[in-house]
Design a protein with these regions (language model features):
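Phosphate/pyrophosphate-binding catalytic cores of soluble transferases and nucleic-acid-acting enzymes
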Residues: 1-307
Length: 307
C-alpha cells in the first residue's frame, strides 16, 4: 500500500506552514488538493503558497492550468494518484494538503468515475430543483431513481447527488454500487486542524484584508485585461467573482471586502461540515497561543505511530 500523509482543515486554519515543515522533516513533497490553486495567475485570491514557499519544497497541482481551462474532481483524482505512485516509487513521501473536500475524499476513498459526461440539460433542471427545494428535493429525486435500480442512495452533498442522478438517468447503477468503500486507498494518517470558530473567523477576516493589501483588485484587473472571461470556472472562486462585481460598479469597495469575508467564512463552515462526515480524520485543536513547533510535534506523533 502506498504511503500518503494527508492534512485537511478549513481555509486559513494554518495548513500551509505545517505542510511545508512536514515536507522538510519527512523528505516529502506537497500535493495541493485545492480546486483553484491549479490556475496560473490566480495567486492572491487563492491564497497560493508564495514564490519562496514553492521554491523551498516541491509542490504539485499548482499553476498547471490557464485561467480559462476547465478542471474537475475526476481529473484531480487521476493526476493525484499518478503523483502519489511516482513519489512513493522514488522514496519520497507525498503530503496531500486540502482544501476542497470532494477532491480529498474522492482520492482517499477511491471514488469510481466513469466515462459518462455531465448532462448539461439535466444539470440546468437540477439547478432549478435545488433552488426551489434544496438538498431535500435532490435527495427525493435521487431516491426515486435509486428505487427503480434497486440500490440505496445516502448522499447529502449537492454535487454528489447531481452526479448520482446523472449516472442513474443514464442507466449506470453499477458505478454507484462500486462506490461503497471498505477502508482507505493509502497507508498513512489523515490529520485535521481545527480552531475555535471565533479564532478561525478572525484569521479569515484578516487574511482577506491582507489579500487586498497585496493587490487582489489589480490581480483581477490584469486577468480581465489579458482576456480571461469573467464567467470562466476559475473566476467562480471566492475573491474573484466579488472583485468583478466591484469593478463593474455593482458594489462598493468596502462592500466587496465584507462580501469576500462573509463568503469565505461560509465556505469554511461548509468545509468543516464536510470533513466532520469523514470519520477517519484525526483532529488536532489549535488556537492563537499554539506555536508552530507545538503543532508540528503533535502531528509528528500521529504520523510516526502510523508508519
Amino acid at each position: 500500500m502506498k504511503k500518503l500523509i494527508t492534512i485537511v482543515g478549513p481555509t486559513a486554519v494554518g495548513k500551509t506552514d505545517l505542510t511545508l515543515a512536514l515536507a522538510k522533516g519527512y523528505n516529502g513533497e506537497v500535493i495541493s488538493g485545492d480546486a483553484y490553486q491549479v490556475y496560473k495567475q490566480l495567486n492572491i485570491g487563492t491564497a497560493k503558497p508564495t514564490t519562496d514557499e514553492l521554491a523551498a519544497v516541491p509542490h504539485h497541482l499548482i499553476n498547471i492550468l490557464e485561467p480559462d481551462d476547465d478542471y474537475s474532481v475526476s481529473i484531480f483524482q487521476q493526476q493525484a494518484k499518478s503523483l502519489i505512485n511516482q513519489l512513493n516509487d522514488n522514496h519520497v513521501v507525498p503530503i496531500l494538503s486540502g482544501g476542497t473536500g470532494l477532491y480529498v475524499q474522492s482520492l482517499l476513498e477511491n471514488y469510481n468515475f466513469n466515462d459518462i459526461k455531465p448532462n448539461t440539460k439535466l444539470r440546468i433542471e437540477l439547478d432549478e430543483l435545488y433552488t426551489e427545494y434544496g438538498v431535500d428535493g435532490l435527495r427525493e429525486y435521487a431516491q426515486n431513481l435509486a428505487e427503480k435500480g434497486g440500490i440505496e442512495i445516502k448522499y447529502t452533498d449537492k454535487h454528489r447527488l447531481y452526479r448520482a442522478i446523472e449516472l442513474m438517468t443514464a442507466g449506470d447503477y453499477k458505478s454507484l454500487i462500486k462506490q461503497t468503500k471498505e477502508g482507505l486507498s493509502y497507508k498513512g494518517p489523515v490529520i485535521g486542524l481545527q480552531r475555535e470558530r471565533s479564532d478561525l473567523y478572525d484569521r479569515i477576516n484578516r487574511r482577506v484584508e491582507i489579500m487586498f493589501e497585496k493587490g487582489l483588485v489589480d490581480e483581477v484587473k490584469q486577468l480581465l485585461k489579458s482576456g480571461v472571461n469573467p464567467n470562466c470556472q476559475a473566476f467562480k472562486g471566492i475573491g474573484y467573482k466579488e472583485v468583478v462585481q466591484y469593478l463593474e460598479g455593482l458594489i462598493s469597495y468596502d462592500a466587496c471586502v465584507d462580501l469576500i469575508q462573509k463568503n469565505t467564512r461560509h465556505f469554511a463552515k461548509r468545509q468543516i461540515t464536510w470533513y466532520k462526515r469523514m470519520p477517519y480524520i484525526e483532529w488536532i485543536t489549535i488556537d492563537s497561543q499554539t506555536t508552530e513547533a507545538e503543532i508540528y510535534g503533535m502531528v509528528c506523533n500521529i504520523i510516526d505511530s502510523s508508519f
